Amino acid sequence: MKKILVLHGPNLNLLGSREPSIYGHASLTQINGDLIQEADNAGIRLSCFQSNAEAELIQAVHQAGIDKINYIIINPAAFTHTSIALRDALSAVAIPFIEVHLSNIFSRETFRHHSYFSDIAVGVISGLGTKGYLLALQAIIKELK
């Protein structure tokens, strides 16, 4: 069975209550549930992990390599603009990944315009809200079939 890992970065545990005008009203639990359902329907095992700690996300990426995860969907959140270490972990395991952002990072503060991940990602989806996760998953399902 093919396996996908969804990684959520810092503060995404607050989705649904954190700045809903930017991030929407869906909770992380709702987003994960929708993704798991979609993957189950396609016969793919999907697991989700959220952490506010960079080291825990790096360890999850390392474990994904050991677990032979086929694909990663990652919303690095604020680590998008700061974490060379998380980027290096993704490069080290060589698992293809899609970078997802709920908001359009290019329409926000200038410090959010740079991503340490985009140039090594298979693709980037930004600004489509929670649909971005689903679109990433649908693209991966088509690729894995």
Swiss-Prot record:
The record marks R18 as: Transition state stabilizer. Substrate binds at N75, H81, D88, L102, S103, R112. Its EC number is 4.2.1.10. It holds the Pfam family DHquinase_II. The active site is at Y23, H101. It comes from the Bacteria. It catalyses: 3-dehydroquinate = 3-dehydroshikimate + H2O. Keywords: Amino-acid biosynthesis, Aromatic amino acid biosynthesis, Lyase. SUPFAM superfamilies: Type II 3-dehydroquinate dehydratase. Pathway: Metabolic intermediate biosynthesis; chorismate biosynthesis; chorismate from D-erythrose 4-phosphate and phosphoenolpyruvate: step 3/7. One of its GO terms (molecular function) is 3-dehydroquinate dehydratase activity. GO terms for biological process: amino acid biosynthetic process; aromatic amino acid family biosynthetic process; chorismate biosynthetic process; quinate catabolic process. Belongs to the type-II 3-dehydroquinase family. Homododecamer. PANTHER family: CATABOLIC 3-DEHYDROQUINASE (PTHR21272:SF3). Catalyzes a trans-dehydration via an enolate intermediate. This is 3-dehydroquinate dehydratase. It comes from Legionella pneumophila subsp. pneumophila (strain Philadelphia 1 / ATCC 33152 / DSM 7513).
